[in-house]
Amino acid sequence: MQSIYLSKIREQNPLIHNITNIVAANFSANGLLALGASPLMSANIEEMQEVPKISQALVINIGTLIGKDREAMLQAGKTANEVGIPVVLDPVGVGATSYRRETISQLLAEVKFALIRGNAGELAAIAGEAWQAKGVDAGQGEVDLKAVAEKVAQRYGCTVLISGVVDIVSDGTQTATVHNGTSLFPKVTASGCLLSAVCAAFLAVSEGNYFSATLEACVAYTIAGECAAQGLTTQVGQFQIRLLDELAALSPETIGQRGRINE
């Protein structure tokens, strides 16, 4: 594929507002910096009418819901909608508890999302499909994940990215699969959360072309993972650091040469 957006991220240094979980915050912030974006990590409800107005994209991640997080997410999402910046939803573990399900239902009802990014279990839960999730992990199921992606995209008028061994990107009318990646991704906590943040950076410079921006973000991130995993087997600590290095080193040429996509 031809890289369109990576250079724009590095030229524009978009500010990405993250309301994310306590497990992922540091990794997501450093990953955005490595990529060329600028992270802003705030979940303070008192700031949610102001921070989205100075940001170029918003990530809402429900991984560790505490205190007034839900209210802050709703306020930030509505403010982001008002000012016209893309909002990314990461519905971490949505199928695990009733509180998470209620939170996602309310967010989807009151906030317009540009992208929903999650694993198979999370997107199956949103689609109302049977799936045996394992906490915040993907779990197992037998449903057609392409159909799930298309169903959710059509229902909410957004782009959907289902992460897995093969990643699926759909906006309800066009669907693509990405075949890059590494088996070390699931061994590092918050690697999916960082992907959501990376997607937000790509969406921030896409001028509304959310499908193509999500597709390039997914390809870029999974290629960085492949490069980081070279020569490693079980060294997940090294992989985590190398992933940041590879995001910083990633070039449009590498994306064009190494991307494996079926459309």
From Swiss-Prot:
ATP binds at residues 117, 163. Disulfide bonds: none annotated. The keyword Kinase applies. GO terms for molecular function: ATP binding; hydroxyethylthiazole kinase activity; magnesium ion binding. NCBIfam families: PRK09355.1 (NF006830), thiM (TIGR00694). Pathway: Cofactor biosynthesis; thiamine diphosphate biosynthesis; 4-methyl-5-(2-phosphoethyl)-thiazole from 5-(2-hydroxyethyl)-4-methylthiazole: step 1/1. Belongs to the Thz kinase family. Catalyzes the phosphorylation of the hydroxyl group of 4-methyl-5-beta-hydroxyethylthiazole (THZ). The lineage of its organism: Bacteria, Pseudomonadati, Pseudomonadota, Gammaproteobacteria, Pasteurellales. Its EC number is 2.7.1.50. Substrate binds at residues 41, 190. Keywords: ATP-binding, Kinase, Magnesium, Metal-binding, Nucleotide-binding, Thiamine biosynthesis, Transferase. SUPFAM superfamilies: Ribokinase-like. It comes from the Bacteria. It catalyses: 5-(2-hydroxyethyl)-4-methylthiazole + ATP = 4-methyl-5-(2-phosphooxyethyl)-thiazole + ADP + H(+). One of its GO terms (biological process) is thiamine diphosphate biosynthetic process. This is Hydroxyethylthiazole kinase. Its cofactor is Mg(2+).
